Amino acid sequence: STTNSTNEDVTATVTFDKEDVIVDGGNVHTFTENGEFTFRYIDSAGNTGTAIAKVTWIDKTLPKATITYSTTNPTNQDVMASISFDKEDVTITNNDGNNTYTFTENGQFEFEFVGPAGNRGTAIAKVNNIDKDVPVPTISYDITNPTNQNVTATITFNEENVTVKDGNTHVFEDSGEYTFEFEDRAGN
């Protein structure tokens, strides 16, 4: 069989330059994992011996993938997911072989990869922290009819966690305009 790194079983065969050699248990051994096997043999003259087969290149372990993100905080920007592995020579078989994927919106992407011994796997990158929508404000007034009293304007939003500069209320002592400045956690 092979002496290259593999995720398959390896077959070792012992051969001799004489035909009168008998191998106890047969001259073939299949390794399902790395290790050693001792072939015991005897020839027609009664000479005995051993031959040791050693295999160290079976790798049936899937490379461990780690996915990191450019940010996990709420953001109004794209998010880049990067994949890395605990083994060298791992090849990404989709995404044009790139180890990064850029999310322009929330969702998921499945990286597909193969390790140096041929072990194939997948890892899913998930993003749910992208918010590119500006919060929609609603302004309400405590008095809506003509009045000679102060009027309080209150701003509310269609989403939570919106910060309003100088607070979410403004008291009008006279007729006029006021601009509320606000930002959500993602920076919109």
Where are the language model's segments positioned?
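Flexible, low-complexity linkers/stalks enriched in Thr/Pro that connect modular domains
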Residues: 1, 53-62, 125-135
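Surface-exposed, proline-enriched loop/turn segments that connect beta strands in immunoglobulin-like
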Residues: 1-2, 25-26, 66-71, 96-98, ...
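Short, solvent-exposed loop/linker segments at the N-terminal edge
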Residues: 2-10, 69-79, 141-151
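Acidic, Ser/Thr
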Residues: 13-19, 72, 82-88, 144, ...
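Extracellular/surface recognition and adhesion modules
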Residues: 14, 39, 63, 83, ...
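Serine/threonine-rich, repeat-prone extracellular segments and beta-strand-based repeat modules
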Residues: 20-48, 90-117, 161-187
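Intrinsically disordered, low-complexity tandem-repeat regions
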Residues: 22, 80, 115, 136, ...
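Extracellular fibronectin type III
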Residues: 49-50, 121
